[in-house]
Amino acid sequence: MKDAVKKYWAVALMFLMVTAVCLLFSCRKSGMFIDEIYTYGLSNSSYAPYITDIKGGNALGQVITREELFDYVAVTEGEGFDFGSVYYNQAMDVHPPLYYWLFNAVSSLVPGTFSKWTGLALDYVIYMLALLCLYKLVKELFGSRDIACAAVILYGLSLLGLSTMLMIRMYVLLTMLSLLLAYLIARLLRDFRPRLCPLVGLTILAGLMTQYYFVFYAFFLCGAYVLYVLGKKEYKKLLHFVPWALGGALCLLLAFPDCIHQLTADKLVSGGNAMENLTNLSQYPQRLLYYFGEVRHGLKAAILVTMVALLALVLLFKKVKTAAGEKSLCLDSLVVILPAFVTLPVVAILSPVLDQRYIYNIVPFFVVAVCLLLYWLRLALEGRERSALISKAVLLAIAALALWQARCVPPAYLYPEYRDYDALVEQHADEPCVYFTDNYFSPMTQDLLQLLHFEDFYVTDENGCGEMLDYLGDCGEFVAYIDISETWSSGYDPEEIIANIRDNTDYDKAELLYQNGLSATYVIAK
């Protein structure tokens, strides 16, 4: 027992620190991004991918009740573990179904519940598995428990890492599977065993069944491994590896044939859009600068460690050179590291919108690159008096730096402003609510958390001011949500909608309650 404590106390401490920070920010999460609400709806609704499908695809002129909204995002009695519905919903969407199956399974364990904690609990478990894969990967590559712990804390408490966990979406699973694939490749690098090749194939299939962007890192990683093996002229290894890797990718067509339509569709999130971005050379600089900036901002602690490590390596160059003549520099770790650096510009160019989530799965490998520098430093210091103590001191200093970064810059997807939105809406929860849109589900999905405050709401378009009067009855005021996004939905001008209401009804006063992305919310009164 004492030996176990001595060996693993640092490992346990790093994971506990990450857990504590994850819990802290989970408690602070006050709202959800629209895609997070899609996660609940696509996973838990019964053969109704989007809110408008609650009303057969056309919500105009209809009333949507709180119960119908709740049924869209929660597993209700008798609907648990309905994986067929999840498969159908994802076939209608733009992503494969693996994460949504897991989400539905977790939601089915707590039927009748709609809470951020359902998604955060699942994401936390997957995040811990991702950190475990990262730990095992670095330990396999560099043979140092302390360096592996440094990787866990540098990534686990990074802005990008915590954002991955806090976004209730498939990206945390995508990251875990990318790390698992890298770990399997690392195992093959160090001790090739044919029985690992089927696991490579299964991991590739699982990654593609999670998010199509898995293909980029997986392709470059497998390609780097093949080139490495060819360089060593160990051709027999490829007879085991290549069929399983290709088979895993091709099995996607059997497991989810709708992927063909999704990848070739002419939508914003599709293969068609990716090809448009590829041919639009003028946007390359903007896209590359954005994503490089996200990495620089989201891995500040790792970058600081890199700068210090490089300076130390320059000062200790002679000792590193001497150590390199006696021990391996672990340059084969570049098989795992370099594909991430190649994937970054590819994703930057092809991503449907500029958003950090598209690079979440490759972020850990930038930390692995930092660990390579730490390994070289370890070689230079090895054999010195109290080298083990120095190693632990460096690890604790890195942990303190990572904690400082997490304290200074909060991760994404917390939405503190949603507390104010909820408070404002709650003041008017007893009043009628009207949603103005051209039957677009996106803005209503974004506003679902606030719409749940109302008993029901009426959906109409810009010309439906007269038709809504039957719904409003003789009330003195009502809440109006106006769909304002020109990119994602109707793009209404609120002033025109309000003027139309004044011209066709007795309601002549309007006060802006708040504005949130795709919609503006007003209180309309007589």
Regions found by a protein language model. Name each.
Residues L13-L16, L374-R407:
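Signature aromatic-anchored transmembrane alpha helix within multi-pass, membrane-resident enzymes
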Residues T118-F142, L180:
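Transmembrane-helix motifs of polytopic, lipid-linked glycan transferases
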Residues C149-A151, L199, I204, V242-L250, ...:
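Transmembrane alpha-helix segments characteristic
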Residues I337-L338, I349-E382:
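Hydrophobic/aromatic-rich transmembrane helices and adjacent perimembrane loops
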Residues A182-L199, I204, F216-A249, Y458:
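Perimembrane helix-loop-helix junctions
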Residues D3-Y8, Y135, K139-L141, R145-D146, ...:
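Membrane-interface helix-loop-helix junctions at transmembrane boundaries of multi-pass membrane enzymes
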Residues A105, C133-K136, I153-L157, G161, ...:
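Specific aromatic-rich, kink-prone transmembrane helix
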